[in-house]
């Protein structure tokens, strides 16, 4: 008789809405431990099967999910690590993880952002801090609250090793949460970072009362900008019309639960960006990504009017009205091969 194989333990690092949602999904598939900084949140998850701070009182988590504030405990028992911490804290957590984690444990990022200062994608940081550990990203049109409430959704798991990606995808998959695989890590990560910037642009439009046609125009042209930069950075063109690109772009631009759309709306209401950030309980990655995206655009010689106008509002004192006037001033050219808005 064959010996029983131990089920791999998934360790999710981070206590926000999406990290908790993914942890609850994984706990329904196998042993899962979630590391959180807050003892109150850990107790809420363990005793009440809820993360009331980020998901409210109505979302009930898997009763097999356990939370801890002991980082060493979490790191030492991990067979798979899922990174749910924001981009600004991502590297620091990985550095601490490197002191405890055994070799070759796969590390999957949930973060759709770029590191300020280095302009690195999250998988690049994983490879730098944890060499030898397979790195991937899980991304797609995933509003955390909807997934946690059981609405049907899908994501794509991007890893260079498709055999490993196929094995790991089963840990995230449920009847209502479909998980596809791809080897285009660059494309998926680039799309995830860019869509946040474009959602801010659409949010600014909502604040101005623009029509549905105008919103569709901005989203469609945003997809072109996303694809141009993503391909220039090494992504595959076919990734961007998919879940991580167009799918995530649509939901982040249109959902009332979107943090980045909210930032755009608040900018349109005349609030300073620092005040908006301070009032939010979770991170809107598009705020930090806007300047980084423009650095890449300049590096590759690309005209990205939507990203440029968002960066101008967030970092250079422009107004929402000036941003949309700037877009309209762009002369339209060839829809596919043109360089303007």
UniProtKB/Swiss-Prot annotation:
Extent of the signal sequence: none
GO MF entries: glycerol-3-phosphate dehydrogenase [NAD(P)+] activity; NAD binding
Catalytic residue list: 195 (proton acceptor)
Biochemical pathway: Membrane lipid metabolism; glycerophospholipid metabolism
Source organism per UniProt: Mycobacterium tuberculosis (strain ATCC 25618 / H37Rv)
Catalytic reaction equation(s): sn-glycerol 3-phosphate + NAD(+) = dihydroxyacetone phosphate + NADH + H(+); sn-glycerol 3-phosphate + NADP(+) = dihydroxyacetone phosphate + NADPH + H(+)
InterPro entries reported in the protein's UniProt record: 6-PGluconate_DH-like_C_sf (IPR008927), 6PGD_dom2 (IPR013328), G3P_DH_NAD-dep (IPR006168), G3P_DH_NAD-dep_C (IPR006109), G3P_DH_NAD-dep_N (IPR011128), NAD(P)-bd_dom_sf (IPR036291)
Coiled coil stretches, renumbered: none
Cellular component GO terms, alphabetical: cytosol
Subcellular location: Cytoplasm
Binding site for sn-glycerol 3-phosphate: 112, 140, 195, 248, 258-260
Gene name of the record: gpsA1
A GO biological-process term: glycerophospholipid metabolic process
PANTHER family, A to Z: GLYCEROL-3-PHOSPHATE DEHYDROGENASE, GLYCEROL-3-PHOSPHATE DEHYDROGENASE [NAD(+)] 2, CHLOROPLASTIC
Keywords linked to the UniProt accession: Cytoplasm, Lipid biosynthesis, Lipid metabolism, NAD, NADP, Nucleotide-binding, Oxidoreductase, Phospholipid biosynthesis, Phospholipid metabolism
Residues the entry annotates as binding NADPH: 17-18, 37, 112, 144, 259, 283, 285
Task of the protein: Catalyzes the reduction of the glycolytic intermediate dihydroxyacetone phosphate (DHAP) to sn-glycerol 3-phosphate (G3P), the key precursor for phospholipid synthesis.
Lineage, highest ranks first: Bacteria, Bacillati, Actinomycetota, Actinomycetes, Mycobacteriales
Name assigned to this protein: Glycerol-3-phosphate dehydrogenase [NAD(P)+] 1
Entry-linked NCBIfam families: PRK00094.1-2, PRK00094.1-4, PRK12439.1
Family affiliation: Belongs to the NAD-dependent glycerol-3-phosphate dehydrogenase family.
Annotated EC: 1.1.1.94
């Amino acid at each position: 008789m064959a010996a029983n194989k131990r089920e791999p333990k998934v360790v999710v690092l981070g206590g926000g809405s999406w990290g908790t949602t993914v942890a609850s999904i994984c706990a329904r598939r196998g042993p899962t431990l979630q590391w959180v900084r807050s003892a109150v949140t850990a107790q809420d998850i363990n005793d009440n099967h809820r993360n009331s701070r980020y998901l409210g009182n109505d979302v009930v988590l898997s009763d097999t999910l356990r939370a801890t504030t002991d980082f060493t405990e979490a790191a030492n028992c991990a067979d798979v690590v899922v990174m749910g911490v924001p981009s600004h804290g991502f590297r620091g957590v990985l550095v601490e993880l490197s002191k405890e984690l055994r070799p070759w444990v796969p590390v999957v990022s949930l973060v759709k952002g770029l590191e300020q200062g280095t302009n690195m994608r999250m998988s690049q940081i994983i490879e730098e801090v944890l060499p030898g550990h397979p790195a991937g990203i899980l991304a797609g049109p995933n509003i955390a609250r909807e997934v946690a409430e059981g609405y049907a959704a899908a994501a794509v798991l991007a890893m260079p090793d498709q055999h490993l990606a196929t094995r790991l995808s089963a840990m995230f998959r449920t009847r209502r949460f479909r998980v596809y695989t791809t080897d285009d890590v660059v494309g998926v990560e680039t799309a995830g970072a860019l869509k946040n910037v474009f959602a801010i642009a659409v949010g600014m439009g909502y604040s101005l009362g623009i029509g549905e046609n105008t919103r569709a125009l901005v989203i469609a042209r945003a997809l072109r900008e996303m694809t141009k930069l993503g391909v220039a950075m090494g992504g595959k063109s076919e990734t961007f019309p998919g879940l991580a690109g167009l799918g995530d772009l649509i939901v982040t631009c249109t959902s009332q639960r979107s943090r980045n759309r909210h930032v755009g709306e608040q900018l349109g209401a005349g609030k300073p960006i620092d005040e908006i950030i301070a009032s939010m309980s979770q991170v809107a990655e598009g705020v930090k990504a806007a300047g980084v995206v423009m650095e890449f655009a300049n590096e590759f010689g690309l005209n990205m009017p939507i990203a440029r106008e968002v960066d101008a509002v967030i970092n250079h004192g422009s107004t929402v009205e000036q941003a949309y006037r700037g877009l309209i001033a762009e002369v339209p050219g060839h829809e596919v091969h043109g360089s303007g808005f």
